[in-house]
Amino acid sequence: MTAPAICNTTETVHGIATSLGAVARQASLPRIVGTVVGITVLVVVALLVPVPTAVELRDWAKSLGAWFPLAFLLVHTVVTVPPFPRTAFTLAAGLLFGSVVGVFIAVVGSTASAVIAMLLVRATGWQLNSLVRRRAINRLDERLRERGWLAILSLRLIPVVPFAAINYAAGASGVRILSFAWATLAGLLPGTAAVVILGDAFAGSGSPLLILVSVCTGALGLTGLVYEIRNYRRQHRRMPGYDDPVREPALI
């Protein structure tokens, strides 16, 4: 990554942090308290929910019979809406269903979970364009509405970016729901397939190249993200009043 690209990326991250600070200052106290309580509950639930062992999953599969794949998909979807590590479900999918069915269940479950989390954020009213009246935020939000799929796709390809964080951030932005869903599905597919194959390898039927896949997808995701950031900044940075506040009152 070149020095200008790193500089642009750093400035963009700083701008996002500044915008989030503005949101915190302008949001009403009940909304802030409610959000903190909600996040705390989600984190506590994620920490307290026990991860089922392989033996427990196999026993569950025997008891449910043909309905087990659907039940597994539903549980995967619901449990990973909070910031619960989805890797356990992804590995279990490969172990229980094999590569093809395991990849399908893991990707569909994760995508459905991401969309639900995104919609929950929007249902609470936490959207930047309604909380912060700045031209820079309005333009960024419009950009995400038009081309947000590329940012989502790039972030999904980077393994170290938290799954839940992308969901919640997308909910606060103007990314279109359908674009978010397709970009999430496509971005999760390579890494999820590698993890499912790893899970399947535990059963003796696969040989994963998880590290290689992670490095390749991460590099591809970073490239797409830097390209989109530089392209956006090139188009908007020199516009007059780029970061001036808008006169209309914020809707809290």
UniProtKB/Swiss-Prot annotation:
Transmembrane intervals: 32-52, 64-84, 88-108, 149-169, 177-197, 209-229
Protein's membrane topology: Multi-pass membrane protein
The keyword Membrane is annotated on this UniProt entry: yes
GO cellular component, as recorded: plasma membrane
Keyword field contains Transmembrane helix: yes
Protein name: TVP38/TMEM64 family membrane protein Mb1528c
Annotated keywords: Cell membrane, Membrane, Transmembrane, Transmembrane helix
Subcellular location per the Swiss-Prot or TrEMBL entry: Cell membrane
PANTHER family xrefs: GOLGI APPARATUS MEMBRANE PROTEIN TVP38-RELATED
Organism: Mycobacterium bovis (strain ATCC BAA-935 / AF2122/97)
